[in-house]
Amino acid sequence: MKLQRQPFEAIRLEQKTIEMRLYDEKRRQIAVGDTITFRCEEEKLSVRVIALHRFPDFAALYAALPHSKLGSTDPKDMVQYYSQEEQRKYGVLGIEIERMTL
């Protein structure tokens, strides 16, 4: 999965442990125990999925999950990536992760 620099670094530093995505067809394939490789430019970072949190929209996700794990405190931040219409159509997913040790 591609990430912008700020969330990539927050995950690398273990300051962000829940990645938020639209619950589209691609994300429906994710299961607890899966490995996800995040990419930012040429860098890669592998994590393990430890929990999945489904919600109807990002407002509900932000209301239920600790902001300290999300890397952001405002659900409106996600509108730049996913419209309200997309959120209503698919729902959203909080992918709880842990860094993998080599």
Predicted segments, located by residue:
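A mature extracytoplasmic/lumenal domain signature
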Residues: 24, 51-53, 99-101
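Short, solvent-exposed secondary-structure boundary/capping segments
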Residues: 53-69
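Compositionally biased, charged N-terminal/linker segments
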Residues: 1-29
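Short beta-strand-centered aromatic/proline hotspots
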Residues: 44-54
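Glycine- and charge-enriched low-complexity intrinsically disordered segments
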Residues: 65-102
